[in-house]
């Protein structure tokens, strides 16, 4: 049984297992939509798409982690004004373009996490149809533990949470750490809640994102605290259909 119910945005969440905070955006209830309980909007019917094959030259997934990730205080390099990251996933690949001026603090954090391969082998553990695809808990418990309290100050919101935009999840004001979501539709309702986008998925890549397995949703998804304390084996055992990031690497703006 899950330990937590999804909670409303900007409500502080208790510490789970070894201290992993539950960070997630929750869609506002709109007059024209009547979601059940706190669930996001109902799923939209997606057209069938064909997975994009990964190029032969793509790097192999790492079987362990970069030890530098155990010291978040040492990973504070300033990101370029603009950079790109290629994600190779179990559904294919997509490219993210980050514009630092949109959200400098978040863009710098993402840059350092990518440089040190934080997201390699991590899963899209929360995919809510017609809302968001969320990732950012490490496949490795020691890494998750190291970043649990590495909070960032909030960036001002300069861009709307449009479809394909990347934004840090949060457990309240100034609590961003490593979790990120990709908006699956225009989520302008998140703008006033302080969610500051910092990057965007390329248009062809959204065909890949739209294919991420979404049938667990919120009701039957994994517990964030147990992801943090047990890592990828916990997800593989209980939620084997979740899609995974094989590698996430800088390809421009290094």
Which residue stretches match the model-derived regions?
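Sec-dependent bacterial lipoprotein signal peptides
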Residues: 1-18
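Cyclophilin-like peptidyl-prolyl cis-trans isomerases
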Residues: 17-254
């Amino acid at each position: 049984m899950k330990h937590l119910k999804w909670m409303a945005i900007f409500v502080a969440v208790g510490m789970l297992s070894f201290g992993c905070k539950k960070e997630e955006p929750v869609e506002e209830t709109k007059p024209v939509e009547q979601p059940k309980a706190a669930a996001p909007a109902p799923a939209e019917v997606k057209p069938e798409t064909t997975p994009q094959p990964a190029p032969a030259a793509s790097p192999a997934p790492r079987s362990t982690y970069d030890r530098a990730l155990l010291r978040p205080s040492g990973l504070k390099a300033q990101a370029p004004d603009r950079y790109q990251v290629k994600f190779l996933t179990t559904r294919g690949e997509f490219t993210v373009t980050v514009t630092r001026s949109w959200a400098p603090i978040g863009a710098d954090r993402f840059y350092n996490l990518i440089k040190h391969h934080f997201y390699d082998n991590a899963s899209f553990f929360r995919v809510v149809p017609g809302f968001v695809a969320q990732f950012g808990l490490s496949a490795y418990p020691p890494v998750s533990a190291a970043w649990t309290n590495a909070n960032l100050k909030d960036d001002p919101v300069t861009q709307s949470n449009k479809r394909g935009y990347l934004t840090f999840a949060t457990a309240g004001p100034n609590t961003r750490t490593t979790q990120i979501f990709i908006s699956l539709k225009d989520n302008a309702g998140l703008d006033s809640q302080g969610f500051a986008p910092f990057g965007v998925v390329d248009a062809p890549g959204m065909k890949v994102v739209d294919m991420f397995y979404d049938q667990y949703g919120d009701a039957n998804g994994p517990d964030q605290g147990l992801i943090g304390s047990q890592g990828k084996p916990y997800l593989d055992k209980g939620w084997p259909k979740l899609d995974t990031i094989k590698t996430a690497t800088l390809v421009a703006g290094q």
